[in-house]
């Protein structure tokens, strides 16, 4: 879901070249916008490195089952010369201890942020984007009569 939102926003800007990396075994029938390059990969370091060469930024939009896999992305990005990494930190900040208590899975997000801090000295900058809750998703699916938008 968040990946599609990011893709739509970035691909609408003609000054940005967008490349999407997707799982080899994905059966998704998603139609990608014109001009977007799509590579299917097994996400191994050896397959990621050549796909990341020449890229300025790597945005990870993986879900909860793949938070820890982002370490491979970080390492491959450094080896390929990527300048900035944006981890899948979307939603509530993993820096908040109360969040970790409520959502233990977010410890994996915090671990990635700590890993990125360690890797800064290797030339990779990073940005964590904590959007808080995705209220439009909550209001549409879980609480359709609680929150209204005009």
For the regions a protein language model found, what residue spans apply to each?
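Residues that line or immediately flank small-molecule/substrate-binding pockets and catalytic motifs
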Residues: 62, 89, 133
């Amino acid at each position: 879901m968040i990946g599609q939102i990011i893709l739509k926003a970035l691909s609408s800007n003609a000054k940005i070249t967008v490349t999407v990396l997707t799982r080899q075994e994905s059966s998704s029938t998603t139609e990608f916008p014109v001009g977007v390059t799509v590579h299917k990969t097994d996400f191994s370091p050896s397959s990621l490195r050549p796909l990341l060469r020449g890229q300025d930024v790597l945005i990870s939009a993986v879900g909860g089952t793949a938070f820890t896999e982002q370490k491979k992305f970080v390492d491959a990005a450094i080896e390929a010369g990527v300048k900035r990494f944006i981890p899948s930190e979307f939603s509530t900040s993993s820096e908040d201890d109360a969040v970790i208590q409520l959502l233990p899975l977010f410890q994996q997000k915090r671990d990635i942020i700590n890993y990125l801090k360690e890797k800064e000295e290797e030339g990779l900058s990073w940005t964590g984007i904590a959007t808080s809750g995705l209220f439009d998703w909550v209001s549409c699916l879980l609480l359709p009569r609680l929150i209204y938008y005009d």
